Amino acid sequence: FQNAWVYRGSVVQCNRYFAPGACTGLTEPINNFEAIPPKDKDGNKTGEKVFVLCDRHCKGYYHWTHEQLPRLGIMYDRLIKDPTITITAPAKGMIMQYLTILGFPKSQVRDLYKKATSDRYPTAFYKTVYYPQPMRCGSILAPQLFLIRKIMFERLSLEAVRTKPVDKENMLVVMADRRDSRQPRNSRNITAMLKARFPNVEFVSHLGKDVKTQITLFNRADLVIGPHGANLGNIMWCKHGATVLEFVPIKTGNLCYYQTASKLDLQYRMLMVPLAIDVAHEVP
């Protein structure tokens, strides 16, 4: 687009408006959008070229890894070669860790996701706006999935395919844990029971580990076990043939992770648990 405003994940021109898709759909609120003059006296709201990456849901791990990050793959080579193209994304936390792994300095990232006032986010005007293909909610598109895997695996020297059969006596099991009500109340008992029954198996939790370590762990994993959420979006980095066991709430379950698993030839298993998605529960 030429000569457009960027407001969070949306692109606005005088006669049209583009929403980012994903789970935001067409509901990205622009009721508080304020079109600033193209030339701002402070010089900090205008720019030449920008790549609009994130929408308002990108701070969620699944939404970031499956609905925002894959959009970067289409423009990756150009963004690396031309650091004058600004990338819009929160410039901190796990998002900045991902962008750093992919080779983007913090100076190339612009955070338009902090409120400028109590009811309005910053607006920025750019002469050229790159806006990649929107993603669907809850179901990553296969071409973008394989493209971002290829890029990430090349950056971290990881493999996409197993080179030897699984040794059932010496497996790596990643326990995808959470710190909220989605985590089963008896999760510690489950882990203790599994460790006692399979003493030679390595059980590792991803909690507290940085993004690079998480990606590497899931890539090495033979089996991933965890509740809905719990950074299960990391199964997109698993090798083909790994097994995923997800604790799925009966009342509010969805097939987000099944969609990813099916595209990557992962062995997906579902264990139904009682109640709804954010209600404290135990795994039977």
Region locations from a protein language model:
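The feature primarily captures lumenal catalytic ectodomains
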Residues: 1-284
